């Protein structure tokens, strides 16, 4: 029984990442550039229908909706080698084509104006699914479209599909040297929606992605294409258990339930090893990829795709390792024992200290130089330090009332700047929740989340 997932790509970053993600899925499932199954793709055992549907002429078409307020990236996708795999009706480019000017308010307001057209596309895709499980959204939170239009769509999806899961892959800005001066404003406003309207958020930040790409590829300034390749590798790895199902973690709700012990703490960080791929071929090869080696590397902070400054109390709430390739379950058991003996991972004091492992097969159609590769999805309290940096940078700008005029012109701010204050309160509540989770008496505390009434997730 397929449990379909509809993918929404919003803005320049979301669509660039999405383009590479679909290319990777096509290669892994033996689908050619026109959407036809290659003659050699006869192995079976994979579920293509989670992410693709078959058209009347039996071509595989992504269940994807591509949204942007300016045409450049979508036009480049429409002229790319894989242009024929998409449903042309699922491209939405705003008729003015002016973009959102790196302004969350403008992206949000434009979403409000055009939401009926976009929801028609989503309804059409949902009606074409037998048993829709949920949505995946790809976007960044620093600019205008991915953050503003993305926020608006999260709210609408919650209203229209209250029982469906929403998972996002959200690219956070490099908080050290971002190229958009107003990114703290856009990030904070988006964070509120990610907290209240998503069930699970995979956090990737540009600072960490650039560092990992530079480290592995030996290039000083990795291109966006190279960092997007890392994101699409993580996305394809995190969906392998859905596409090559085993007994466990074979649907999105299973993955989310195993990683998120309390509903608000649903921001996940990832590690992946070893990196290889078309655009990453300069990556230094790691000679011996045993299960233990892969699992140990996944726990190394330098492999995390999030820049955090963990404190002494920071700890894991949950870990799911997705191991692809030739892995023997007894090796996994031994590796887990070794990790426990060496105390390589510190867990919350009030829950089970368990690393969950899902073994999945690799695509038979993609050659890999590694026997085993692994992705770690982890819920770690240290992620709150990233949110603290966003709040601190927001407060610095707000104190000076810097760059607020362009926001005041937009609909969400017509009655003042309360939208900012509410967002800050929600994010501070989230930070407090993660910090409280580090205490042994977390579950027995009587404090309820302040914004429970606002919480719209499918819990």
UniProtKB/Swiss-Prot annotation:
**Where in the cell?**
Cytoplasm, Cytoskeleton, Microtubule organizing center, Spindle pole body
CDD domains documented for this protein: gamma_tubulin (cd02188)
Q: Which InterPro entries match?
A: Gamma_tubulin, Tub_FtsZ_C, Tubulin, Tubulin/FtsZ-like_C, Tubulin/FtsZ_2-layer-sand-dom, Tubulin/FtsZ_GTPase_sf, Tubulin_C, Tubulin_CS
Q: Which UniProt keywords are listed?
A: Cytoplasm, Cytoskeleton, GTP-binding, Microtubule, Nucleotide-binding
The UniProt record gives the binding positions of GTP as: 142-148
Q: Region entry Disordered: which residue ranges?
A: 440-459
Query: May I have one GO cellular component term?
Result: equatorial microtubule organizing center
This protein's major location comes to cytoplasm
Keyword Cell inner membrane carried by entry? no
Q: Where is the signal peptide?
A: none
* One GO term of the biological process aspect: mitotic cytokinesis, division site positioning
Q: Name one GO molecular function term.
A: GTP binding
| PANTHER family xrefs | TUBULIN (PTHR11588)
Q: Spell out the family assignment given in the record's similarity comment.
A: Belongs to the tubulin family.
Q: What is known about what this protein does?
A: Tubulin is the major constituent of microtubules. The gamma chain is found at microtubule organizing centers (MTOC) such as the spindle poles or the centrosome, suggesting that it is involved in the minus-end nucleation of microtubule assembly.
The entry's protein name is Tubulin gamma chain
Q: Give me the gene this protein comes from.
A: TUB4
């Amino acid at each position: 029984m397929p449990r379909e997932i509809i993918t929404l790509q919003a803005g320049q970053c979301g669509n660039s990442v999405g383009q590479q993600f679909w290319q990777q899925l096509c290669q892994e499932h033996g689908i050619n550039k026109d959407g036809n199954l290659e003659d050699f793709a006869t192995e079976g055992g994979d579920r293509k229908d989670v992410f693709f549907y078959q058209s009347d002429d039996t071509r595989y078409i992504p269940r994807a909706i591509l949204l942007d307020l300016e045409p450049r990236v979508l036009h480049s996708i429409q002229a790319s080698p894989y242009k024929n795999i998409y449903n042309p009706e699922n491209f939405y480019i705003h008729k003015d084509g002016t973009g959102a000017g790196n302004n969350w308010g403008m992206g949000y307001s434009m979403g409000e104006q055009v939401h009926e057209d976009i929801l028609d596309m989503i309804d059409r895709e949902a009606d074409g699914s037998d048993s829709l499980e949920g949505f995946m959204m790809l976007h960044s939170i620093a600019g205008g479209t991915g953050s503003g239009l993305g926020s608006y769509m999260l709210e609408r999806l919650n209203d229209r599909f209250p029982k469906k899961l929403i998972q996002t892959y959200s690219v956070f800005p490099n908080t050290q040297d971002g190229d958009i001066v107003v990114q703290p404003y856009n990030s904070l406003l988006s964070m509120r929606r990610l907290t209240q309207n998503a069930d699970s958020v995979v956090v990737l930040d540009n600072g960490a992605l650039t560092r990992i790409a530079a480290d592995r590829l030996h290039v000083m300034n990795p291109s966006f294409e190279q960092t997007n390749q890392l994101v699409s590798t993580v996305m394809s790895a995190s969906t392998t258990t859905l596409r090559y199902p085993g007994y466990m973690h074979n649907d999105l709700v299973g993955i989310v339930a195993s990683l998120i012990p309390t509903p608000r703490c649903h921001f996940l960080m990832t590690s992946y090893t070893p990196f290889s791929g078309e655009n990453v071929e300069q990556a230094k090869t790691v000679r011996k990829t045993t299960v233990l080696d892969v699992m140990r590397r996944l726990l190394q902070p330098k492999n995390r795709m999030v820049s955090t400054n963990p404190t002494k109390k920071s700890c894991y709430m949950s870990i799911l390792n997705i191991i692809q390739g030739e892995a023997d379950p007894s090796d996994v058991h031994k590796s887990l024992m070794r990790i426990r003996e060496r105390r390589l991972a510190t867990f919350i004091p009030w829950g089970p200290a368990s690393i969950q492992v899902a073994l999945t097969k690799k695509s038979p159609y993609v050659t890999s130089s590694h026997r085993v590769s692994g992705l770690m999805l982890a819920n770690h309290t240290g992620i709150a330090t990233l949110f603290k940096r966003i709040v601190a940078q927001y407060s610095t700008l707000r104190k000076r009332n810097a760059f607020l005029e362009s926001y005041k012109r937009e609909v969400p701010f017509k009655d003042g700047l309360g939208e900012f204050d509410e967002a800050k309160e929600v994010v501070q509540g989230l930070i407090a929740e993660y910090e409280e989770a580090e205490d042994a008496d977390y579950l027995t505390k009587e404090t309820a989340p302040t914004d429970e009434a606002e919480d719209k997730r499918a819990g």
